């Protein structure tokens, strides 16, 4: 089972990724983890990537694709894999297609922007422990205070409404075209096209999980 999981920040991808990994016993592969591992191992591609990273530049797509091809040859990928946060752009998706990296399913977790802003801007965090709350969905016993210590909760910069709105803008500009790319490819019925599935990310986590796993044949 080879899966790409798409969706905006705050759509609940991380939660569903865990369910998919467990159901199919496949590794979750992120480009960040892959880059760090290759740099640490000192592979040729890892050293090449490190040069770009050290200079503050973006690692080029051909290096990323090379790392992907290396990673999916590992023993833990024999039953498949789940790509998390990759590909991010159409050139990366095209490069992956040209490199012969076949995908079975592309799953999009679809949540409206206003719901994502509500979810993320309502988060409150107790910084010393990392405990998180939500003003609507999981409020603390006393507003603005940690349940355990009684200390103040804060809204992290990442969770502020204007920051969330900016991240969504980047997502729509950069990643949303991938949704069209994969859905059009699937609709054309090409022999090696992945199946494209859009699942609503609204509602109970368990129901979304059921729909995702059912779409993947579980």
Curated annotation (Swiss-Prot):
Keywords tagged on the record: ATP-binding, Cytoplasm, Kinase, Nucleotide biosynthesis, Nucleotide-binding, Transferase
Gene Ontology CC terms: cytoplasm
Query: What catalytic reaction does the record list?
Result: AMP + ATP = 2 ADP
Q: EC number(s) for this protein?
A: 2.7.4.3
Q: Where does ATP bind?
A: 10-15, 123, 132-133, 203
Q: Which GO terms describe its molecular function?
A: adenylate kinase activity; ATP binding
Identify the InterPro entries for this entry. Answer: Adenyl_kin_sub (IPR006259), Adenylat/UMP-CMP_kin (IPR000850), Adenylat_kinase_CS (IPR033690), Adenylate_kinase_lid-dom (IPR007862), P-loop_NTPase (IPR027417)
Q: Which Pfam families match?
A: ADK, ADK_lid
Q: Where is this region: LID?
A: 122-159
Residues recorded as binding AMP, renumbered to this chain, are 31, 36, 57-59, 85-88, 92, 156, 167
Matches recorded under NCBIfam families:
adk (TIGR01351), PRK00279.1-1 (NF001379), PRK00279.1-2 (NF001380), PRK00279.1-3 (NF001381), PRK14527.1 (NF011100)
Q: What is known of its domains?
A: Consists of three domains, a large central CORE domain and two small peripheral domains, NMPbind and LID, which undergo movements during catalysis. The LID domain closes over the site of phosphoryl transfer upon ATP binding. Assembling and dissambling the active center during each catalytic cycle provides an effective means to prevent ATP hydrolysis.
For this chain, the family text in UniProt reads:
Belongs to the adenylate kinase family.
Q: Which PANTHER family match?
A: NUCLEOTIDE KINASE
Q: Which HAMAP family match?
A: Adenylate_kinase_Adk (MF_00235)
Query: Could you tell me what this protein is called?
Result: Adenylate kinase
- State the organism of origin: Methylobacillus flagellatus (strain ATCC 51484 / DSM 6875 / VKM B-1610 / KT)
| The organism's taxonomic lineage, starting at the top | Bacteria, Pseudomonadati, Pseudomonadota, Betaproteobacteria, Nitrosomonadales
């Amino acid at each position: 089972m080879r899966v790409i999981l798409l969706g905006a920040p705050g759509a609940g991808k991380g939660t569903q990724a865990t369910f998919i990994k467990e159901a199919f016993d496949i590794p979750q592969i992120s480009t960040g983890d892959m880059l760090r591992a290759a740099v640490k191992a000192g592979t040729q591609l890892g050293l090449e990537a490190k040069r770009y990273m050290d200079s503050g530049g973006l690692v080029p797509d051909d290096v990323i694709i090379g790392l992907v091809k290396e990673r999916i040859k590992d023993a833990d990928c024999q039953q498949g894999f789940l790509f998390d946060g990759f590909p991010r752009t159409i050139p990366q998706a095209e490069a992956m297609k040209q490199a012969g990296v076949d995908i079975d399913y592309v799953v999009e977790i679809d949540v409206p922007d206003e719901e994502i802003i509500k979810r993320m801007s309502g988060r409150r965090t107790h910084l010393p422990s990392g405990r998180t709350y939500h003003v609507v969905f999981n409020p603390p016993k006393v507003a603005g205070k940690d349940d355990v210590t009684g200390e103040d909760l804060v809204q992290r910069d990442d969770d502020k409404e204007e920051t969330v709105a900016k991240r969504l803008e980047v997502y729509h500009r950069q990643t949303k075209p991938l949704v069209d790319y994969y859905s059009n490819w699937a609709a054309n019925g090409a022999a090696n096209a992945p199946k494209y599935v859009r699942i609503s990310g609204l509602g109970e986590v368990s129901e979304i999980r059921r729909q995702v796993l059912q779409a993947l044949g579980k």
